Design a protein with these regions (language model features):
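Charge-rich, well-structured scaffold segments of protease-associated domains
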Residues: 1-106, 142-143, 173-326
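His/Glu-based metal-binding/catalytic segments typifying zinc-dependent metallopeptidases
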Residues: 102-166, 321-326
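Short amphipathic alpha-helix segments
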Residues: 166-174
């Protein structure tokens, strides 16, 4: 081993101090991850836990390094100003490099197992009395075996991906409830989370949730061809910007390959997006925005608000609506 046990112990102290610092930080994302992922490893920080860091040895570290950095566990993605022949030469030369040959990676664990997306809905509060406003994240589970990734990204753009989206127009501009509100997606192999994120005065929290739910309920009837046309450029001609600076394209191709997804060229992506229509957007909005897919995380000055009150607000009044058949 390159490191001695003494050197490793010294490095562990640095990492553990960083873990302490991260644990002291209060973020919506941390609370959200714990609430959504529960026992799944995705709820943990990238640094791991103090217990795990203290527990491994130099031999453990070297073994793991060999397992990860091995010839059977390498993906090389090349994009940019390079022709096919030169790419082939690079791949051939790269293939000759001996990187821990014969070391097999252990079977990969599924990111999400079992009933993760058939769980009971969650409402979580975290009180910080000194804050002026509450941070809110309303999230919905998405099954990517039923909804394509590009369809989800397109729907996200329509809902809250930018100016002109339904949430920005109604919640921020028309009603003036929030300074900013947006939606985003976290994508994994076969699952995704679509989240609506905003900050608001506590006195307006319940009203904002009601208004957002009202919009989400209406999407299955109001998404129009105009909405699709307005967003289409972002998913077709704008993709050619990837060819000017190919870092994002490179990352996307590598990510798709590692997640066992179809690896698409820019032309393929444009063609797939051009097939999206408003009827499909209505259909998947009805599939996603349902009671059983929903979680709510609120942090800030939450005194006087209870999880039961928010559950009643979310799952009670709109129970029949969210239990409609697909």
């Amino acid at each position: 081993p390159i490191w001695s046990e003494e050197q490793l112990e010294s490095e562990k102290k640095v990492v553990i101090n960083e873990i302490y610092e991260k644990e002291d930080e209060v973020t919506l994302e941390k609370i959200y991850d714990k609430a959504i992922w529960r026992k799944n490893p995705l709820k943990r920080g990238i640094l791991g836990s103090e217990e795990n860091v203290k527990g491994f040895t130099v031999d453990d570290l070297v073994g793991y390094k060999k397992e990860i950095f091995s010839k059977n566990n390498v993906t090389l993605v090349i994009t940019g100003a390079i022709d096919e022949e030169k790419s082939r030469e690079i791949f051939e030369e790269f293939g000759k490099i001996k990187i821990n040959e014969g070391v097999e990676r252990k079977e990969k664990v599924e990111v999400i197992k079992g009933r993760q997306f058939k769980r009971e809905p969650d409402v979580k509060l975290k009180n910080f009395a000194s804050w002026n406003i509450v941070d809110v994240q309303l999230s919905f589970d998405v099954d990517l075996t039923k909804i394509k990734e590009n369809e989800l990204l397109f729907l996200n753009s329509i809902i809250g991906g930018g100016d002109g989206s339904y949430l920005q127009t109604e919640i921020r501009e028309n009603q003036g409830l929030v300074y900013d509100i947006y939606s985003c997606v976290d994508i994994f192999s076969k699952e995704s989370i679509l989240s609506i994120i905003f900050s608001i005065d506590k006195s307006r929290l319940q009203l904002s949730i009601l208004e957002i739910i009202k919009i989400l309920k209406q999407l299955k009837n109001i998404i129009s061809k105009k909405d699709v046309d307005r967003n289409m450029a972002f998913f077709t001609e704008n993709l050619w910007y990837w060819a000017e600076e190919t870092k994002e394209l490179n990352f996307q191709l590598g990510s798709d390959f590692l997640n066992d997804k179809e690896v698409l060229t820019i032309e393929d992506r444009i063609m797939a997006n051009e097939r999206i229509d408003f009827q499909r957007m209505r259909e998947i909005s009805e599939m996603i925005f349902r009671k059983e897919n929903m979680s709510l995380i609120v942090i800030g000055p939450t005194k006087g608000i209870t999880e039961n009150k928010l559950r009643e607000l979310l799952y009670g009044k709109y129970d029949n609506e969210y239990n409609e058949k697909d």
